[in-house]
């Protein structure tokens, strides 16, 4: 039988790759919905205004890419003085974000300390019950 060994090797390699891909998917961290969002940069503050004016001038345009391209070109053409109001708005939002983030981190630290204490008290209560599964049977296996 030709190719039997190579097919087995390739099937084995494929199985290993699938397992690796499956483990990568499960490792993704869950985002906390209460965490404050990062503030927009000066360019994105500019784009908020630019999108409104662009839609007024071009109401039939549905392409996001075209709006983004036009906004990027316009941003590049602006002088530093014209960019200044957007930069200052971005700085204000950044300062507000930093305050919110500090408050969030304090709240998380306080919550973690409370959770740790509750885990300690819970473990003291449940120490006796850890070996019991509620079935009334002994967990050890007998080979009769």
Swiss-Prot record:
Ranges where the record places region Disordered: 1-42, 85-144
TM regions (residue ranges): none
Primary localisation category: nucleus
DNA-binding region: 36-105
Tissue-level expression: Expressed at higher levels in dark-grown tissues, such as roots; and at lower levels in light-grown tissues, such as cotyledons and stems.
Gene Ontology MF term list: chromatin binding; DNA binding; structural constituent of chromatin
Pfam families noted in UniProt: HMG_box
Gene3D superfamilies assigned: High mobility group box domain
The name this protein goes by in its record: HMG1/2-like protein
Species in which this protein is naturally found: Ipomoea nil (Japanese morning glory)
